[in-house]
């Protein structure tokens, strides 16, 4: 997605060989026009999948998930990382290791909002080692719902998360795939098209 790649190049900051800071438009401050375009792109890519619900994780996945849900006409449920006084019982639970924060979080979804009749699109901001996506998949599977695919805003293709998910037969659609963050420079995976002769 060209507009997203341009935003990453212009406003993203490489903090190390494996950390990209995008708090200017995605993780802290949110660019609603960009989020709207991201939502439209996810909806376009998954429009034939009969999505009934979008599942994401708090907090950075919420904006792109809501925009995609608006386009698809479905609801969003986000996995919580912290216990809530209003959500104590009747929860699906999974443990997720955060690459960025270097900690394990227990995530949960209420059983009241997802069931075996749902066809779910999982959306998240980043895909690195795949732990958040695997945790969200576990919650969806516990509910007996089916997974239509996973939409990722930014995939770090140099880490193994995307490979692990795809090897499990999961459809993963990433809007920007980063090949490298070496030397403080963002390099995108080049989508090569085969020429028919």
UniProtKB/Swiss-Prot annotation:
Gene: xpt
Binding site for 5-phospho-alpha-D-ribose 1-diphosphate: 128-132
Pathway(s) per entry: Purine metabolism; XMP biosynthesis via salvage pathway; XMP from xanthine: step 1/1
SUBUNIT field: Homodimer.
Signal peptide range: none
Reactions catalysed according to its record: XMP + diphosphate = xanthine + 5-phospho-alpha-D-ribose 1-diphosphate
InterPro entries assigned to the protein according to its UniProt record, in alphabetical order: PRibTrfase_dom, PRTase-like, Pur/Pyrimidine_PRTase, Xanthine_PRibTrfase
Family in the record: Belongs to the purine/pyrimidine phosphoribosyltransferase family. Xpt subfamily.
Species this chain originates from: Bacillus cereus (strain ATCC 14579 / DSM 31 / CCUG 7414 / JCM 2152 / NBRC 15305 / NCIMB 9373 / NCTC 2599 / NRRL B-3711)
Protein name per its UniProtKB record: Xanthine phosphoribosyltransferase
Record keywords, A-Z: Cytoplasm, Glycosyltransferase, Purine salvage, Transferase
């Amino acid at each position: 997605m060209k507009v997203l790649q341009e935003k990453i190049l212009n406003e993203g900051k490489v903090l190390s060989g494996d950390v990209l800071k995008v708090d200017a438009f995605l993780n802290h401050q949110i660019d609603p026009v960009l989020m709207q375009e991201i939502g439209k792109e996810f909806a376009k890519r998954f429009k034939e999948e009969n999505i009934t619900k979008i599942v994401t994780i708090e907090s950075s996945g919420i904006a792109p998930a809501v925009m995609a849900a608006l386009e698809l006409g479905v609801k969003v449920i986000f996995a919580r990382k912290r216990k809530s006084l209003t959500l104590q019982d009747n929860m699906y639970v999974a443990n997720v290791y955060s690459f960025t924060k270097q900690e394990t979080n227990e995530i949960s979804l209420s059983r009241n909002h997802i069931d075996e009749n749902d066809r779910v699109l999982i959306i998240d901001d980043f895909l690195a080692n795949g732990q958040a996506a695997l945790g969200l998949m576990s919650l969806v599977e516990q509910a007996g719902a089916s997974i239509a695919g996973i939409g990722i805003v930014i995939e770090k293709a140099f880490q193994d998360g995307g490979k692990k998910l795809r090897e499990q037969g999961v459809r993963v659609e990433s809007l920007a795939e980063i090949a490298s963050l070496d030397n403080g420079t963002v390099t995108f995976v080049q989508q090569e098209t085969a020429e028919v002769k």
